[in-house]
């Protein structure tokens, strides 16, 4: 039986809100000059934001050692709730030694602006190699997620946080839709079943195919591209957003899709990040989540369908969101349409396999992706953006 989004509980039962009230903000600002400060990097800023708006419910702050250890080893919080990615605030030994457990810590963004507060309850050291092997399935420093891990501080700070205020996104204010708002939008549209789609690439024809396959069985599609920190060679968020707008304008039913930004940072943790992405979309009100080929993967670190198999390690009720697993879609030159091996009679040589990586490689060579790869309007926008980048 279908449920309205208002009946879809956030992970852990309640949607978290750690945005300071006006009174709290006034109090924190009055204490600013007296508080020790920690400067956050781009990823920590996005984590702070996602905790505050409820995207990372049930987390109310950065993880303590008990939660951290169990997440790394078992993909569960200390209370047994499924959670697959450590959300931590790491600092150097020197910075950690200057902070007192039990006190407040001022959190600044990379520009030095005061954006949040941490109630410091615990400082603890952790094993980076153990985290790398368990979370990323590799200790290779060339892996982008492992590289970030190895470069961060040796001590984690734990405790509840407050975001001083929810400011508009500088690039995409119209698409900044927090979990409270997305749930309301789903209710207003009367959607009972909503499928979420995570992406950090412009949508190519294979993505479009699996999204529309999913949309045949649910009420709405929540297209939720990630605009937080990504790899240097990933296509810039502003370019990707223009591509999404173009695609939705020409090729999708207007009343069945909502486009919103996901401010989180990529970890490139493959299977574990697939679980994480699903739980985040559950917090936004989704009932289903698309898991395709090599979800959240990078290079050859993960098997093609490892990110689908990991969902089988949990009881369905533990996750509270339904994974929709799709095979690798391709363009079939025999039938002249998108398909998978489940629906196509084609031989391997009649299949044009698509990927964001291939599209990026073609653009760098100055080639326009063919219509089998990308819709013409999207390909033209990508090519225009690449020319601008070369000239800059």
UniProtKB/Swiss-Prot annotation:
Q: Under the GO molecular function aspect, what terms does this record hold?
A: ATP binding; sulfate adenylyltransferase (ATP) activity
Question: Which positions are tagged coiled coil?
Answer: none
Its pathway?
A: Sulfur metabolism; hydrogen sulfide biosynthesis; sulfite from sulfate: step 1/3
Q: Does the keyword Transferase apply?
A: yes
Which keywords does the record carry? ATP-binding, Nucleotide-binding, Nucleotidyltransferase, Transferase
**Top-level EC class, please?**
transferase
Q: Which GO terms describe its biological process?
A: hydrogen sulfide biosynthetic process; sulfate assimilation
| Listed SUPFAM superfamilies | Nucleotidylyl transferase, PUA domain-like
Q: Which InterPro entries match?
A: ATP-Sase_PUA-like_dom, PUA-like_sf, Rossmann-like_a/b/a_fold, SO4_adenylyltransferase_pro, Sulfurylase_cat_dom, Sulphate_adenylyltransferase
Catalytic activity line of the entry: sulfate + ATP + H(+) = adenosine 5'-phosphosulfate + diphosphate
EC numbers listed for it are 2.7.7.4
CDD domains hit by this protein = ATPS
Family according to the record:
Belongs to the sulfate adenylyltransferase family.
| HAMAP family the UniProt entry points to | Sulf_adenylyltr (MF_00066)
Q: What is this protein called?
A: Sulfate adenylyltransferase
């Amino acid at each position: 039986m279908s449920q309205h989004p208002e009946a879809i509980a956030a992970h852990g039962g309640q949607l978290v809100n750690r945005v300071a009230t006006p009174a709290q903000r006034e109090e924190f600002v009055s204490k600013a000059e007296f508080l020790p400060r920690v400067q956050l990097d781009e990823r920590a800023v996005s984590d702070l934001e996602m905790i505050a708006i409820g995207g990372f419910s049930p987390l109310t702050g950065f993880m303590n050692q008990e939660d951290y250890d169990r997440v790394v080893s078992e993909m569960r919080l200390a209370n047994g709730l499924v959670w697959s990615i450590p959300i931590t605030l790491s600092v150097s030994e020197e910075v950690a030694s200057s902070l007192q457990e039990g006190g407040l810590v001022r959190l600044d963004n990379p520009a030095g602006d005061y954006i949040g507060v941490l109630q410091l309850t615990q400082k603890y050291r952790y094993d980076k190699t153990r985290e790398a092997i368990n979370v990323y399935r590799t200790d290779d420093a060339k892996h982008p997620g492992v590289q970030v891990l190895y470069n961060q501080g040796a001590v984690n700070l734990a405790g509840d946080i407050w975001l001083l205020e929810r400011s508009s996104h500088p690039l995409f204010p119209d698409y900044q839709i927090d979990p409270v708002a997305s749930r309301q939008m789903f209710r207003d549209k009367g959607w009972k079943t909503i499928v979420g789609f995570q992406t950090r690439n412009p949508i190519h024809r294979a993505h479009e195919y699996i999204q529309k396959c999913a949309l045949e069985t649910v009420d709405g599609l929540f297209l939720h591209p990630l605009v937080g920190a990504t790899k240097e060679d990933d296509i810039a968020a502003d370019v990707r957003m223009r591509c999404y707008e173009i695609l939705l304008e020409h090729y999708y039913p207007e009343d069945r899709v909502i486009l919103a930004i996901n401010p989180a940072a990529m970890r490139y943790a493959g299977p574990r990040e697939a679980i994480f992405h699903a739980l985040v979309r559950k917090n936004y009100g989704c009932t289903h989540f698309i898991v395709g080929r090599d979800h959240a993967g990078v290079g050859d670190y993960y098997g093609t369908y490892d990110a689908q198999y990991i969902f089988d390690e949990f009881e369905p009720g533990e996750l509270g969101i339904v994974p929709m697993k799709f095979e690798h879609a391709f363009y079939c030159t025999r039938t002249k349409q998108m398909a998978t091996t489940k629906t196509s009679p084609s031989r391997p040589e009649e299949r044009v396999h698509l990927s964001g990586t291939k599209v990026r490689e073609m653009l760098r060579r100055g080639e326009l992706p063919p219509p089998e790869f990308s819709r013409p309007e999207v390909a033209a926008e990508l090519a225009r953006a690449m020319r601008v980048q070369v000239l800059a």
